[in-house]
Structures are given as C-alpha cells and as structure tokens.
Amino acid sequence: MSLDIQSLDIQCEELSDARWAELLPLLQQCQVVRLDDCGLTEARCKDISSALRVNPALAELNLRSNELGDVGVHCVLQGLQTPSCKIQKLSLQNCCLTGAGCGVLSSTLRTLPTLQELHLSDNLLGDAGLQLLCEGLLDPQCRLEKLQLEYCSLSAASCEPLASVLRAKPDFKELTVSNNDINEAGVRVLCQGLKDSPCQLEALKLESCGVTSDNCRDLCGIVASKASLRELALGSNKLGDVGMAELCPGLLHPSSRLRTLWIWECGITAKGCGDLCRVLRAKESLKELSLAGNELGDEGARLLCETLLEPGCQLESLWVKSCSFTAACCSHFSSVLAQNRFLLELQISNNRLEDAGVRELCQGLGQPGSVLRVLWLADCDVSDSSCSSLAATLLANHSLRELDLSNNCLGDAGILQLVESVRQPGCLLEQLVLYDIYWSEEMEDRLQALEKDKPSLRVIS
C-alpha cells in the first residue's frame, strides 16, 4: 500500500472489515484513490459512493479488477454526481461492467465536465453498450480527452458512433480500441471520422483489430494530417510489406512528428524494413519502435543497423525480439552499440545470437562511447562461455543499468563471473534479471549477499 496525505493506493489486497473501516475516512479526503484488485463487493461500493459524495478533492478514482458489476458501478457513479465533484480520471477496467450498465455511465458523463480520462477496457460492453456510452460522450458538458476500450467485444458497428464522437470533440487526444474485432471496415470508418475531426489526436491504438494493408492508405492520411499524433500502435495486424509501403509516405510527411510506432507481429520482412528505414533516416522525432515478432532476418537487422548509424536517426528504444536474427547480424549491432549516441534500450531477446553473437555485442558495449542503458538478451542461446565477455563488459561500460539474461543455459560458473564483476564499485548495473535460470544453494547465498552488500542492485529471478 502507498499512502500520503493526498493519495491512497492499494493493490492486490483482500480488505478485512476492520481494514475497510480504517480506510473509509481516507476515501473522504484523498485526491487520488486507487483500489486495484481488492475484492470490492456491492456493499462496499455503497460505502465508496457515500465517501465520494463528501470528497470535493477527488481527482482520480481507480477501481480496476474488482467484480463490481453493473449494480456496483451504478453505486459508485452516484457518489460522483454531486456539484462539488471535480474528478479528472476514472478507471473501471475489468469491473464486470456490461452493455446494460452503460446507460447509467452515459448519464453520468453528462454531469462530469472535469472528467478527462475514462478507462473501460476488459468489460463486455458490446456494440449496444458502446452506442449508449457515445450518447453521453456527445453531450456538450462532456469534455473527455482520453478513452480506453480494449477487449470490450466491439465490432465494426461501434466505429460509426466513435467516429461521431471524434468529429464532435475538438479536445479529444487519445483513443484505444485494441483487441476488438472492428476489422477493415471499422478501421476505415474511424479513419474517416478522424479525417473530418478538428481534434488534435496524440495517440491512436489499434492493436489486434483486424487492420489490413488496405487500411494503411487511410492511416497514412491520418499520420500526414494530424501533426499532433505522437503514438501509433498497430501491433498484431496483417499489414505486411505492402502495408508498410502504404504507411511510410504518411510517416515521411513534413508535418508528421510521430514519436512511438508499435508494429510488432505485422508480417513485415526485410523488404518492409527497408521502407521503414527511410523514415528512420528522415525523422529525428521517432524515438520508440517495436518490430518484435516480424521475420526480418539478418538482412533486416543489417538494414536497421546501417540506418541507426545515420545522423538523422535518433531512435532511443528498439524492440526486435523474435525477429529471426542469428549471430551473423551481431557485428552490425555491435557497431551501433559502440557508435550510436541515442539508442538507450535494445530488446533483442528470443533470437539465436548464441555465444559468438553475444561476444560481438560485448565488443560494442565495451567501447567508451556506448550509451545503452537497458539490454534484453533473454532466450538467446547464451551459455557460460559468454559470461567472461559479459563480466568484462559490465566493468568497462558505465551506462548500462539493466541486463536481462533470462532463460539462457547459464550455470554456477557463468553466474559467478557475473557476480564478481557486478560486486565491484565500478560496475553501475542496477538490475540483473535471471528468470528461468537454475543455480546451486551456494550460488543463491552469493546472490543474496551481493544484494545486501550492494543496495543499489536488484537481482530478479
């Protein structure tokens, strides 16, 4: 539990009656109330409602992962329907809300002009519930800016009501509808709504929505026309290389200032990677890129690394987990690690880099100019024979703060070499992640002693 005079933050705690009685006065005065996965019941929703009625300071209420149901949510919302309520953020994610409960929520939105964020993911709202919700969102008194609707059982039929909201609300900034089967037709309707909207959208998240390569032309227009757009999440959609070719002209548009692009598991190969590299070279604004789960291969890795060495590329975070890389591409990544002055985070797990590849990476990391702070090498077929190189690198490199070696074939001999380096004052590593690695009791004692002797370090296993 986290508690100060302004916030109450409790997660994953079954609250006894005595504990609940202790917390009730705090619900009446805290600006931020988070009761995440606390086993709240309908009866306690009535207590929450009563407390909120007399709490004019409340700015954020998070009740996610409690089985409130429609009746419980109704009770809570009644507590917010007071003239003094100034709530800005409401999270009812995974609260067993259904479409039937959306009518009350819709009515409440009309009475909360200060509400800016609404999180409703993981509730079975359905198209009928979404229609009711949008009626409230369209009210002039509603000034919502951010709406999250992941896993809400929506179809393409929900996209026209959402498009109407986008057209009507110039203050709208973020829309998340990931993991709903809105498919190609629904995405096209949303894009048309955004095209017609004066809103300054900052984030659009459409992961696992059935987006196709044909939709990428529509999305290209959105990226080009919305200079405010900073994040575009399209992961787990069948875009393919054709889709990337359609999307990239929008990303290259002079007005595009996209910062984050998530296109993991999109069926992209080295060919599509080539189109994307043109964007990376031209757009200093692009800082975060996920290509995880695409079959880029070593050729795709080479293209990416050559681009990362270009002065126009200022990428800070690159996720290329599960991209079918081998040790053959590691010399290219080594050059990037040695020379690139912007890349801070590299997720390259679940690629067959093997010991030879990791040794190549260590050569780059050991150079004086290396700035990388986080490196994920989980499940890369690394063995104890790589650990001498890794150990030397940890002493030579003064930027690396987190290293993940989970699910590799390491034993006591390799881990001992890492421990001997990490325990040195000159090693600045703060987090060593070793999930699914097995060692002796003696090594367990060494790791516990290491954490005790060096409080700045966490060993996670």
Curated annotation (Swiss-Prot):
Record PTM Phosphoserine, positions in chain: 91
Modified residues (Phosphothreonine): 82
Impact when changing residue 209 to Y: In IIAE12; uncertain significance
Effect of residue 296 to P: In IIAE12; uncertain significance
Impact noted for substituting residue 373 to W: In IIAE12; risk factor
Residues bearing the modification N-acetylserine: 2
Alphabetical list of SMART domains matching this protein: LRR_CC, LRR_RI
Principal subcellular localisation of the protein: cytoplasm
InterPro entries: Leu-rich_rpt, Leu-rich_rpt_Cys-con_subtyp, LRR_dom_sf, LRR_RI_cap, NLRP_innate_immun_reg
Cell location: Cytoplasm; Nucleus
One GO cellular component term noted in the UniProt record for this chain: cytosol
Chain positions covered by the region annotation 2 X 5 AA tandem repeats of S-L-D-I-Q: 2-11
Listed Pfam families: LRR_6, LRR_RI_capping
LRR repeat boundaries on the chain: 20-48, 49-76, 77-105, 106-133, 134-162, 163-190, 191-219, 220-247, 248-276, 277-304, 305-333, 334-361, 362-390, 391-418, 419-447
Description of post-translational modifications: The N-terminus is blocked. At least 30 of the 32 cysteine residues are in the reduced form.
Keywords linked to the UniProt accession: Acetylation, Cytoplasm, Disease variant, Leucine-rich repeat, Nucleus, Phosphoprotein, Repeat
Result after altering residue 319 to A: Substantially decreased binding affinity for RNASE2. Binding affinity decreased 5000-fold over the wild type for RNASE2
Highest taxon listed in the record's lineage: Eukaryota
Disease as annotated in the protein's UniProt record: Encephalitis, acute, infection-induced, 12: An autosomal recessive disorder apparent in infancy or early childhood, and characterized by acute encephalopathy triggered by viral infections and febrile illness. Neurologic features of the acute episodes include seizures, hemiplegia, decreased consciousness, hypotonia, abnormal posturing, feeding problems, and respiratory insufficiency. Disease severity is variable, ranging from death to normal neurologic outcomes.
Self-association and partners: Forms high-affinity heterodimers with RNASE1, ANG and RNASE2.
Comment field on protein domains: The LRR domain forms a horseshoe-shaped structure that interacts tightly with target RNases via a large protein interaction surface on its interior side.
Function according to Swiss-Prot or TrEMBL: Ribonuclease inhibitor which inhibits RNASE1, RNASE2 and angiogenin (ANG). May play a role in redox homeostasis. Required to inhibit the cytotoxic tRNA ribonuclease activity of ANG in the cytoplasm in absence of stress. Relocates to the nucleus in response to stress, relieving inhibition of ANG in the cytoplasm, and inhibiting the angiogenic activity of ANG in the nucleus.
Name by which UniProt lists this protein: Ribonuclease inhibitor
Organism: Homo sapiens (Human)
Gene: RNH1
